Amino acid sequence: LEQGLRAVKTPYTLLLDADIELAPGIVSALYQKARQENLALVSLMAEPPMLNFIERLLMPAFIFFFKLLYPFALANKPVSRIAAAAGGCILVETQALRLAGAFSSLQDALIDDCTLAAHIKRAGLRTYLGLSRAARSHRGYPGLKPIWEMVARTAFTQLRYSITLLLICTLIMIAMFLAAPF
């Protein structure tokens, strides 16, 4: 990635996971948002595929859990210390990426996208994270194991491997589910 970044001559760099499909016009929309709102990093959490029962059952809960751990509204506030990004789709100012230490600063990060957002915010720059159907993931989760591994990598890491915090978050999710109007 560092070798590729050295060849970048554009003011913005688009970082995409290989399984992400973007709707027509979304890159220009991200660019416009970045320019109009003076954002150094714009990130979209891609819509998961929802092709099988386990995905339809667990992926909405994972997205909800991710938003509990990384509240988008707080992450998007310049004064907030909370930083978050979804690595599937990130448009970042090339200079900001370099200022943040580029990819070498992420080599030991367990959650590289959120770490990148944190580096950029610490540099005094603004970030944005949103949900969108304009970025769609084609990465399938055929069973419980790959979903559990993803949750363990993201959520459990953010909770500092605390079973107590995991149980609290789980109880909050259950309470919100039970309190939801159906």
How should these model regions be labeled?
Residues Q158-F182:
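Alpha-helical bilayer-embedded segments of polytopic membrane proteins, i.e.
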